[in-house]
Amino acid sequence: MQRFHIEVLLALVTGWCALALPVFATDHTHYDAAFLPVMRDVVEGIRPLSLGLLFVAGVCLGVFAAAPTWVLGLGSVASLPAWSAIDMFMGEDHNLFPIEWTIYALYALTSTIGAILGRAIRKQIIW
């Protein structure tokens, strides 16, 4: 695998962990879903700490990864619209999915801004 693909996969994993860990670390409501109910728990239970961790993940990715910052930002939340689409096709009701995906884009913006800040930090550090 090329470095770019590894970095995008790393962004996906770190982004999902940043969103999921605060949800699972506290008491949360368990939701039913046609596909991966655990993902619905994450989507319905996102907390401000989740977004803060997503920003920190973006900063770390921006410092250490070479992929474009917008790719890192989108990659960090790519699991959310992917889950939403699969869940829709399996019969769940996502009648407000355009709004849902707009919110996911705002989450990606959080991570992208973090990655841009990480790039600025990397330029200031002498390796």
Q: Which residue stretches match the model-derived regions?
A:
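Alpha-helical transmembrane segments of multi-pass membrane proteins, especially transporters
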Residues: 7, 72-76, 80, 103, ...
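Membrane-water interface at the C-terminal end of transmembrane alpha helices
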Residues: 4-10, 108-127
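Alpha-helical transmembrane segments of polytopic membrane proteins
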Residues: 39-54, 99-110
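Aromatic-anchored segments of alpha-helical transmembrane domains
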Residues: 14-25, 74-88
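Hydrophobic, membrane-inserted alpha-helices
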Residues: 53-61
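Hydrophobic transmembrane helix segments
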Residues: 13-49
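Membrane-helix interface "capping/anchor" motifs
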Residues: 3, 60-74
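Membrane-helix boundary connector in multi-pass membrane proteins
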Residues: 82-105
